[in-house]
From Swiss-Prot:
The gene is tsaD. InterPro entries: ATPase_NBD, Gcp-like_dom, KAE1/TsaD, TsaD. It comes from the Bacteria. NCBIfam families: gcp_kae1, T6A_TsaD_YgjD. Belongs to the KAE1 / TsaD family. Required for the formation of a threonylcarbamoyl group on adenosine at position 37 (t(6)A37) in tRNAs that read codons beginning with adenine. Is involved in the transfer of the threonylcarbamoyl moiety of threonylcarbamoyl-AMP (TC-AMP) to the N6 group of A37, together with TsaE and TsaB. TsaD likely plays a direct catalytic role in this reaction. The keyword Hydrolase does not apply. Keywords: Acyltransferase, Cytoplasm, Iron, Metal-binding, Transferase, tRNA processing. This is tRNA N6-adenosine threonylcarbamoyltransferase. It catalyses: L-threonylcarbamoyladenylate + adenosine(37) in tRNA = N(6)-L-threonylcarbamoyladenosine(37) in tRNA + AMP + H(+).
Amino acid sequence: MYILSIETSCDDTSVAILEDNKVLSCIIKNDSKQLNPFGGIVPEIVARYHEENIIKALDLALQESNISLNQIDKVAYTNQPGLPGSLFVGEIFAKTMAYALDVECVPINHIHGHILSPFINSVPKYPFMSLIASGKTTSIFLVKSANEIIELTKTRDDAIGEIFDKVGKALGYDYPAGPKLDKYFDISKATITPSFPPVKNDFSFSGIKNKFLSIINSSKMKNEEIDTITIGSSFLKYSIDLIIKKLKYYKDEYSVDCVCIGGGVANNNYFKQEIKKLFSDSFVPESKYSTDNAAMIGFAYYEKNK
């Protein structure tokens, strides 16, 4: 079975082609550099980028997979959550392709794609705990099967990737700021140590975001030199430690010793290090599948319907 999958939930335009659970091609187009002047996502602009890029991505995916359109058996697309305008572009494109090819068109939850992404091209190991940490969400799930995914906790305000970008911007880093925070991280300089909230509470990142933005803005107002390494390292360590504490709580609560990590924050080196200390079995997606991509949407479709 050949699956054409489409992902347009935020600013990445992605088209993939799979043969069952095997990825034949996955094209990702992103115009994030053009968003630098705005310091982040502008929904109307990224929706327009999707319109400009989606046919190009499809053409490249077909070329790379050596598959023709008339061989496609199913079309899968991201339908939620995400930016409404971006999702709309992907949905209309997917439904148009499915209608033209006379095949079934199936909506897939973007988060479920991230949850299953560590197992792309392989077989999931159920049950497992899943953390999705990205610019749009920060949630922990108990995954019993591809069709039995239970949300244990989520962020009540900002997502971790979102505060990475906002604090990173204040430190002078381009969007997305996560890679720069990771690059300049020095644990010996992480000397700013706010207290942690009760572990049973839902995630909340707005308070820590505001605390570090206040530190940065205070230095700017006093014309003091901003110690980007100390502030960035302290901010990153606190944010990651907050997640690790929450994971430990649910690990003990449900006696699950396998964890899967999805979303862009999975690329962070300090985070990977701490995860390996906590869980005996951990899975992260390949780097090319750790951010938004259509391969995970096609793979999620396959797992839910095999």
